[in-house]
């Protein structure tokens, strides 16, 4: 029972390492609690402890799913609570798998298990969670370190590299607690090496400025989600963004949020967007507009970002939100959603590789909504893309943890790629992030705001931009695989000796 409580407590604590709280030290302490109960557990017990940890981690950390479904998604309280509980129960399977893998593969000393096997198993299952069934890489532990020295690893090995070092640090802290004086000295020295050594990467300038800084304006309309799609509000909403844009012709680039236009592009092109584009060209300004886009051929709907200005272009969202923008396993699940009276949009995913949008004289890497939480997907436009743009509408989640957690992920994308991130949202967090992942300017949440600041286009490539997630994932998968093979070989050898004649 004590081990179960420790595991659950560790999971409950972990979300406080992330935004909006930012108690980064909680992350290694939380993992250290989990590793402690795994040390003396069987594989099945370790899976149970991992599952309890996951229930605490996601039950607190993604509680905003209920807010989205109940307050803004049209679900009744019981359906929203039930589906949120099912989602948390599913996510908790991944820490459970990490426990099973870590103990199954992790024979040997405390140091071998806490420094090699457990951290590697944790990272592998985090990666799996971010890939399986379209992926949900939320609350990956590396994000908790966006304001610590470990962040310096991100341009080299990405968020998984940061997460792996963090898990190793948790193992070192646990070893310092459990081992004798000699082992404790080794563990503390190792922790110092990790903390000090990782900061040395901050001295390397992986990317460099390309041209002069550019004045940009990010529009935050603060349109309430329950009013956004009302037909009678369409004209008022679009006119508001047009008026805000006209007040900032002194900027080189102006960005509207995701689906800032609550109508299809074709419905507002002539009445609003074409005249605005003509004005933008006269002033030498480019405007990026978030708008749904309809293609009659094939009857397809896209979540799009459209460029108005010198070089018109379109970007169609590639990574759609399951159950929000498309329905997986439609023949089975459509019936369930009908019973629960949950409305669902049905968009088409854009092509994996699309021509980069051009704005303010440079190619950019666009992402819409939660596409920016997938680090690997931000790399498809590098090194050509000079800066990152993310447009989103986190009004779906109200004043919950979600907008702050999402902002933290955008900061990691800037850090990994060595590029500025321009982030325009409906209600927040809207801001400019520099190439080192540091906020330059941030608009207050839940206010109508036009945030103006300077953005520096960048050139060059970080190691992560060249390699992606594969070195970190390959290392961790290799550790788990080698330890598995070694333990099986030792078990087979032991059985063989027992079977030899003459042995008692």
Swiss-Prot record:
The keyword Repressor does not apply. It is a multi-pass membrane protein. Residues 219-457 form the CN hydrolase domain. It is an enzyme of class 2 (transferase). Signal peptide: none annotated. It is found in: Cell inner membrane. Keywords: Acyltransferase, Cell inner membrane, Cell membrane, Membrane, Transferase, Transmembrane, Transmembrane helix. GO terms for cellular component: plasma membrane. Its EC number is 2.3.1.269. It comes from the Bacteria. Pathway: Protein modification; lipoprotein biosynthesis (N-acyl transfer). One of its GO terms (biological process) is lipoprotein biosynthetic process. The chain crosses the membrane at residues 6-26, 47-67, 83-103, 105-125, 153-173, 186-206, 465-485. The active site is at residues 258, 317, 369. One of its GO terms (molecular function) is N-acyltransferase activity. HAMAP family: Lnt (MF_01148). Belongs to the CN hydrolase family. Apolipoprotein N-acyltransferase subfamily. Catalyzes the phospholipid dependent N-acylation of the N-terminal cysteine of apolipoprotein, the last step in lipoprotein maturation. This is Apolipoprotein N-acyltransferase.
